[in-house]
């Protein structure tokens, strides 16, 4: 599965990638392409807000993921503060205090992954997360059928 593809990945580009992968792996595996899409609302313990409201407000965006650019680009405006931490960052009390100071009374929007780490901190009243979804560019039915077939074969052993 080739992940985080642009939604505009053409059939010709998919074929090129498949050919290159097959040359490198010397296997004739099925290859699938997925993309990430963002929700139209951010969520918190208190409820949801439309992304449009976040895009038009002065908030703090926080990401501790490997490549946060698309997350920031989806939500930010010229007033937005963007904070980046390393992937899988363990937020210390000092980190949380620094985030709180930089945010002031602004909303804080983070990734689902970081929300899990921060939801019970002093940030919880102003903390929201942006849900993501992984979708197949094409052939999702074939992928599902392949997985189900494999599982059925394994249980018959």
What are these regions (language model features)?
Residues 75, 117-125:
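Short loop/helix-cap segments at secondary-structure boundaries that form the rim of catalytic
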Residues 86-87, 123-154:
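Short, flexible loop segments at boundaries between secondary-structure elements
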Residues 12-16, 122, 142:
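Generic recognition of short, well-ordered alpha-helical segments
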Residues 1-107:
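C-terminal accessory "lid"/substrate-recognition subdomains
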Residues 68, 97, 135, 155-157:
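Nucleotide-activated sugar donor-binding and catalytic core shared by glycosyltransferases
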Residues 82, 107-112, 128-131:
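Conserved active-site loop/cleft motifs that coordinate metal ions or position small ligands
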Residues 7-9, 115-116, 135-137:
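Short acidic, S/G/P-rich loop/turn micro-motifs used as interaction or catalytic elements
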Residues 65-68, 111-117:
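Short, polar loop motifs at secondary-structure junctions
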């Amino acid at each position: 599965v080739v992940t985080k593809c642009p939604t505009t990945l053409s059939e010709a580009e998919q074929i090129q990638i498949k050919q290159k992968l097959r040359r490198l792996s010397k296997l004739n595996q099925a290859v699938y392409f997925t993309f990430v899409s963002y929700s139209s609302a951010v969520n918190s313990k208190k409820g949801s807000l439309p992304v449009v409201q976040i895009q038009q407000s002065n908030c703090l965006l926080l990401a501790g993921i490997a490549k946060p650019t698309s997350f920031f680009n989806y939500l930010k405006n010229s007033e937005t503060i963007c904070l980046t931490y390393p992937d899988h960052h363990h937020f210390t009390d000092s980190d949380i205090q620094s985030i709180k100071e930089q945010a002031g009374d602004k909303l804080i929007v983070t990734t689902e992954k970081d929300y899990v780490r921060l939801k019970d901190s002093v940030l919880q009243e102003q903390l929201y997360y942006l849900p993501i979804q992984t979708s197949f560019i094409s052939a999702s039915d074939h992928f599902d059928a392949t997985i189900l077939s494999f599982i059925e074969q394994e249980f018959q052993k």
